[in-house]
Amino acid sequence: MLCNRTCPSSDCGILCNHSVPSFPPFHSSVANIHFTKENNLKSNIFEHNNNSPTLRSSSVACNTCLKIIRNDSFHCTKCFDFDVCRDCYAKQAFLHPCPKPHFVLVRSSIPSVASLTCSVNSMSVSPQSNFMYAICDHCEQPIHNVRYKCSVCDDYDICESCLTDNSHSNTHAFVRITKAYPHGLPSFHLFPQFLSAELFESASTVHRSVQCDNCLAHPIVGPRFHCLVCEDYDLCSSCVSHVHHDHHSMLRLTREISASPLHLSKPEKPKVLNFDFKLVEDSILPLELSPGCPFYKIWHIRNTSCQSWPSPLYVKFNGGDKLFPGDNPYSFPITSSVHPGEDVNFTVALKVPEKSNKEIFTAFFNICSDDGSVFHKSLCAFLRVPKSFSRISKSSF
């Protein structure tokens, strides 16, 4: 496309985007393309506005569609790691929490196939590389082929390279996943392996009562992989990469946790208490929040059942978005019995996410007794974040 401005030449191969309103004005061209003896493609990419070129590696994923960026993209200079591919930028189909975003065009270090009519073999990305639709929480790079997901936390994934040196809790076991899930993968919500890091360190790395079902090694020394689909099927670290069904998730256990074979099942549902209540009012403190700011969510409820509630009572997280660090938020306990018709305030300490592409956050909580029993109705915390992420008012809840 030629622009209405004065260009050096209409035959110089200049690509003009002045007439496209979705992109900032620029002229760019690809020059000095040559092949080495190793058939590696090299190019010098420059812009006519005399700015220094910015090259992009092929390992960056779009923060909107999560696809690997092959061509040019846009990077927010105000943020540490926020990139949008050209398609999502043109459609304006992305949510960015930065108060004052400033996007700059970033050139791909590998020219596109369409523009250079080169073969697919010249690309540096292996055709066998399988994107797992997840970003490593340790190295912040896209995860390929093998994904390790925390079995306890809602959203924590690492790649195979970061498995041994990640800083995540060693009491949490990881699940080995080899199947890509484009539409997301539900959390496993298993219990931690050990109650404390001290118990984990004191446990043995030899799984005395377990035998590898492939090489028949007994006992399994080092990481043990337990199939979450099959009944009583375990593999050692040497066999897990080339045997068994590719799409079966395997729980990775680094320490011995029992003297008998592991039989995983869903946790027993807690006892349900048929106490009824009515939500009178809910509020937050402070009234104005900013990213990363801690706050209190308060539910003012009334006992509408015919009997008194036992004490103590707590609020426990039951799903949705995690608006708190750790496994559960701090809840202020109700230390006295609540009689029919009486009002009580349940308060939980939460925190506004510091960086997120989401606009709406929803978290659910249960009222629990001291023995783990739960009320049959849940409490909900709803948070709507403005696109500017500069102010969050009380009306957002």
Swiss-Prot record:
PROSITE patterns in the record: ZF_ZZ_1, ZF_ZZ_2
Binding site for Zn(2+) 2: C76, C79, H96, H102
Annotated SMART domains: ZnF_ZZ
Main location: Golgi
UniProt: Zn(2+) 5 binding residues: C212, C215, C236, C239
Xref: InterPro entries: Ig-like_fold, N_BRCA1_central, Znf_ZZ, Znf_ZZ_sf
Residues involved in Zn(2+) 6 binding: C227, C230, H244, H248
Zinc finger residue ranges, ZZ-type: 57-112, 131-182, 207-258
Binding, Zn(2+) 3: C136, C139, C159, C162
Subcellular location as annotated: Golgi apparatus; Endosome, Multivesicular body; Vacuole lumen
One of the Pfam families matching this protein, by short name: N_BRCA1_IG
BP terms from Gene Ontology: cytoplasm to vacuole targeting by the NVT pathway
Keywords, sorted A to Z: Endosome, Golgi apparatus, Metal-binding, Repeat, Vacuole, Zinc, Zinc-finger
Coiled coil: none
GO cellular component entries: fungal-type vacuole lumen; Golgi apparatus; multivesicular body; NVT complex
MF GO annotations: cargo receptor activity; zinc ion binding
Record-listed Zn(2+) 1 binding positions: C62, C65, C85, C88
Binding site for Zn(2+) 4: C150, C153, H168, H172
Cited function: Autophagy receptor that interacts with and facilitates the transport of cytosolic hydrolases Ape2, Ape4 and Lap2, and of mannosidase Ams1 into vacuoles. This Nbr1-mediated vacuolar targeting (NVT) pathway depends on the endosomal sorting complexes required for transport (ESCRTs). NVT components colocalize with ESCRTs at multivesicular bodies (MVBs) and rely on ubiquitination for their transport.
Protein name: Autophagy receptor Nbr1
